[in-house]
Amino acid sequence: MGWLGDNSEDSTGAVRWVMDALLGKRESPSQKYRREFAQDDTNNRLQVPRSAGARRRRTGSLDSEFRARYELLPDETEGAGASLLSPVDLRPAGTAARESGTPGRAGWAGGAAGTLGGGDGGCDGGRDGDTFGRARGSEDVAFRPPRADNPLVSALFAQPSSPDAGLPGSFPGRAPRARDPTHDYLALLDQLARNNRDLHSLQQDLEAREERDRRETSYRDRYLQLRQELIQELKQSKTMYDNYTALYERYKALKDAEHPDYAELVSKLEAQIVDLTIADQQKDRRHQEELLRLQLQYEARIHELERKLNHQNSTYTANDTATPASTVDSGSISPYHKYNDTIDTQFLNHIVK
């Protein structure tokens, strides 16, 4: 049984698939796809390793492989949040499938060589094809917008034409310009993807700003707390310093009261010594002056006495010349014949002492 190009009743070619998808025949495309794949798996016995992240397919909707094969839009309830945030890929289906590793139309239609205009890929042997229990993984199928030349999208967005447009007898006017909304649809999807990316970046910026505001708030609170703690520490330090100063003043006063100031006492004694020294010097000077005065006085007295003595001696000498020596009275001897200057020296020393 072939996939495409077979004219038998049980065969399903590309045209039958499209007609069934658009017009809704007796069998849904998903049921035909499952039946064809199960038959192909039974005939070919594909043995491939099971995907670690595979999950069971949904029986009530189209499979992701089927949507990827025919480039159909996904369900609104399945993967809506992830598709809105993912960027729109405007590349051809074959190129995107080869780069992302997701089987496209050419990959799934490669079972029959030369069908559908000679597809550029064969049957993907790496996909899970076990009908009895092993499901295909659909989480690796990336969202791709339909191509502009997709007949399904063109048929969905085509404007209905009037059946009377080609009747004869009407005035031939300008042929209406066919407006293909496919490009607008793709541009809208691309704009939505860009908006989603901008919203995502804006959300990240807002989260970063909120995180920065939280950090700044925490830093400000911590700074105020540390500032208050430092103020308290400074107040306690000032109080402790004041108490220490007062205690030191009291200790110094007690020490001065118990022990006199020896330095002051020494200075007083030194002053007394200086005063006594000056007094002694003055006393010595007075004694020297008194001694000099007495010496001069005694010298004057001595000179006077010597003068008198010489005068008397001269007188006696004259008398002696007049009278003989034998007649001189022994009782008239001068009282100074026994004078000695030692007596005067001892007397002066006694006065000085």
Swiss-Prot record:
Residues 107-124 have a biased composition (Gly residues). It comes from the Eukaryota. Transmembrane segments: none annotated. GO terms for cellular component: cytoplasm; spindle pole body. Keywords: Coiled coil, Cytoplasm, Cytoskeleton. Residues 27-38, 125-135 have a biased composition (Basic and acidic residues). It is found in: Cytoplasm, Cytoskeleton, Microtubule organizing center, Spindle pole body. Residues 27-64, 93-135 are annotated as: Disordered. The keyword Cell cycle does not apply. Residues 187-318 form a coiled coil. Homodimer. Component of the spindle pole body (SPB) required for insertion of the nascent SPB into the nuclear envelope and for the proper execution of spindle pole body (SPB) duplication. Connects the central plaque of the SPB with the half-bridge. Required for proper localization of CDC5 at the SPB and for proper M-phase progression. Belongs to the BBP1 family. This is Spindle pole component BBP1.
